[in-house]
Amino acid sequence: MQTYLPTTDLLFRKMLTAPDSLHILKAFVKDLLGIEFQSLKPRETYHIETYKHFYEKNKRAGVFHTEVDILAVAEDGSHTTIECQVRSHPHFIERVTYYLAEAFRASYGNLTASGDKKDNHYSSLRPAYGINIMDFHLFGENQKALKRFHLLDEETHAPLYLEKNKELLILCFLSLVNKNIEAHSPAWHWQYFLATGEVTDSAPDYIKEAKVKTDFANLKREEQKMIMDIEKAKAIHGAELSGARLEGLQKGREEAKCELALKFLKIGNTLEQVSEVTGLDIETLRKLEREQE
């Protein structure tokens, strides 16, 4: 039977945002971010029907994601964004920083939701944290696989806190391909599971449960079909993009040959000489001459 990694879009969402996955989500955030919340709930809960609607909407728009975005809200109103990015692309750090800033400003002015009676919209702002899972080297292969970035005082390295003694912003990155990580630490177990789909005997019970939940053989038939359809669509889309790139390269090479041929013709070379140098046939060269007249 075909196997799929837990980083597959549907499986990653199910693992962290299904109604019975709250304890897995909470442990995942604690192990990677280093903060233990009393409660943590996803903004959008995973259900196969809502996921199908989400996928069909993106499919109609021609969007084929290589990343998974999850937003979770804690009991204190803080927001944690979780992204699983399987492919490297330009400006990744800028993008995740933008998402973090958006998560921070999301509660601005929402005094009712924050329970804050102060007549000041800034008092409604809550901390924002970002967790980014990457299947590539972002900071270099010899850097630590798990990296956290905080707002710190330049001299004392003390974190910048809000009034309620909460850190303002934290960005966390876990590379699945970087080997510089403490063996058998909670983060190591997550890295091993997400990268291979397997768990060791010493893995925490919640990671073992995450494996059972995301095992393809344990999925409902509807979920299995959805995953296979999505992966097939991605493969077709990827092949089309690859073909378009090759076609563009070929077209570019032909245009370069034509430009070179015209230069040779203008300085008095014969059609036969230009054909031998550029590889263009005589008829094509004559056509180029006529177009220049």
Give, region by region, the residue ranges found by the protein language model.
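Conserved single-residue anchors adjacent to enzymatic active/cofactor-binding motifs
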Residues: 1-223
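Short, charged alpha-helical interaction segments and adjacent helix-coil junctions
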Residues: 2-3, 80-85, 185-293
